[in-house]
């Protein structure tokens, strides 16, 4: 073992306040199909056009898969990527392929000790989908799955997700000032989003008592989105 390898291993043992911030390499995550893409296939159909759109979604969001199987399906790697193209966090989620519910959820960084022998750079104030943010019109939702369905249903709107298990922060919303933004909270975060961000941004509570994911799926089918 050389000095560099020893330093990398020791870095994973250091207290959090002593760790250096090192970028997770872009080529460390290979896009692949998983329980989430299997779910999308099951609810949206397997027509060639839809399959191509889902494949394109996998590449744009750099969705990956773990080799850990639950319910006969691979876990989904949902990386958060900043505007510089750096992977700065994310989630690893196993989805129920039949209904899209979450079977198991874990933060991406919790897997890094077993995947890498070096420390990592994490920024909790980055949206899922932020690396694709270029226009002025954007929607903010809680779950990554919702943002992906929204992109398929309304491709002209940029969809951002806070991420399962994460909270919307002032730092995240500061980056959206000057854009046309609509926040669609679920029933768990509607009070906080409305009270904390309602003064500067539009908060629409239309989906606090109905399933936004099912709405998007129905919209795709009804409009026959290609």
Residue ranges and their predicted role:
Residues 1-84, 132, 220-226:
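TOPRIM metal-binding catalytic domain and adjacent DNA-binding surface shared by DnaG-type primases
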Residues 12, 16, 30, 98-99, ...:
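A generic structural micro-environment signature
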Residues 68-177:
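Phosphate-handling DNA/RNA-contact segment within nucleic-acid enzymes
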